[in-house]
Amino acid sequence: VRDRFDDFVAQRLDRLLRYATALTCDPHLAQDVVQETLLRAQHRWERIAGLQAPESYVRKMITNEFLSWRRRKASRNVTAAHSTLDAIGTPTADHAEHYAERDAMRARIAALPRKQRAAIVLRFYEDCTDAEIAEALGCSAGTVRSHISRALSTLRAADGGRRRGLPVTEALS
C-alpha cells in the first residue's frame, strides 16, 4: 500500500501543486495545503486507491483543505503570487505593462470570496464541468453558475470594465 501511495505522489505531485497554487494564489500555502492533504490521504490510501478516480478524490481533498483553511484564516491577507500565470496572457509590446496586468489580475483573483475563487479555478484551470465543480464544492450546479458569474462580474468591475491585454477567462487557463 505504501509503495502504491508513493508512486501516486511521485507521478502527480507537480500537477497537484499547480492546482493548489491556482487555488491559493500563494505557492507556499499551496505546498502546505498539498502536504496536509497528502498526509490525510496516506492514512486512507487503501480506500482511496480503490476508487475509480483517486486523483480526482485527492484534488477534491485539496479543494476542501483550501476552503477549510480560508475559514480558519479568514482575516489573513493572501499574497497573490503564483508562477503558473507567468507565461499566460496576450503578449504586449511592453513587458512591464504585461507584468503589471498579470499582477493586477492575480490580486483580483486572490480577493474573490473562497468559493468563487475555487469555482473559477476549477472551471478555467482544471476545465471542470458545472456538475464536477458542484460536487467538489458541495453545492448545486446552479450555485456553481452563480459563483462563476459573480466572480467574473467582480473581476470585470475591478478592472473598471476595461478589456486589456489579460482577459479574465485567460488568467487561469
Where are these regions (language model features)?
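A short pre-motif secondary-structure segment
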Residues: A119-R123
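A short, charge-rich alpha-helical start-of-domain segment used by transcription regulators
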Residues: V1-R18, H28, Q42
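Sigma70-family region 2
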Residues: E36-A53, R72-A74, A158
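Arg/Lys-rich amphipathic alpha helix in sigma70-family domain 2
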Residues: E46-A49, K60-A81, E97-H98
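Acidic, proline/glycine-rich intrinsically disordered inter-domain spacer in sigma factors
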Residues: R76, T84-A110
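Residues within helix-turn-helix
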Residues: H28, A131, G142
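Structural recognition of an alpha-helix C-terminal capping motif at a helix-to-coil junction
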Residues: D32-L39, Q52-N64
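DNA-recognition helix of helix-turn-helix
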Residues: L137-R162
